[in-house]
Amino acid sequence: MEHREWFAPEEDKDYIKSLLSTHTGIIWKAIETVSGQTAGLFIVVFPGKNSENLGYDIGLPEAELCSVAHMDTVAVHPNFRGYGLQRLLISQAEEALRKTQYRYLLCTVHPENSFSHSNMEKLGYTYIKQALKYGGLPRCIYLKKRT
């Protein structure tokens, strides 16, 4: 995988299985219709009051932590990059979350990942701060607050 350091260390098949089996995450997949190949995927995580909740990093009150959704992981196959698939997947997830209690949409982006920084800003996310996350890795935290 290109730029492995842009991803958190725990993002593997076991991580995904755990999210699905505990109902603490949802996955969106984009499938190329002719070949059936996975073009991209996007994971949303519902951290609750887990210590990894990015709400703690931005100073949300305890009562708001269960309103946080992590716009967690996006991966687009190299053959499908450049078509806006990352933004499309995130937009689909946001639409699905629109009528839920999740008002604080938070994500992290590696400081050198200019593509994701640009996409998050185009989607209306605001840069909040840089912090060390995932065992000491530098990450920029973005927030989109829904009313």
Locations of regions flagged by a protein language model:
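Active-site rim helix/loop that mediates acceptor-substrate recognition in acyltransferases
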Residues: 5-33, 43
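A short, internal acetyl-CoA/4′-phosphopantetheine-binding micro-motif in the GNAT/acyltransferase core
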Residues: 31, 59-61, 71-81, 109-110
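Conserved acyl-donor/pantetheine-binding loop and adjacent beta-alpha core of acyl/acetyltransferases
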Residues: 37, 43-73
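Conserved catalytic-core motifs of GNAT/GCN5-like acyltransferases
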Residues: 47, 108, 121-140
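Conserved acetyl-CoA-binding loop-helix of GNAT-fold acetyltransferases
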Residues: 76, 82-95, 118, 122
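Conserved beta-strand-loop-alpha-helix junction that forms the acyl-donor binding cleft
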Residues: 78-81, 107-117, 134-136
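Conserved active-site alpha-helix within GNAT-family acetyltransferase domains
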Residues: 87, 99, 111-129
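Conserved GNAT acetyl-CoA-binding A-motif
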Residues: 97-109
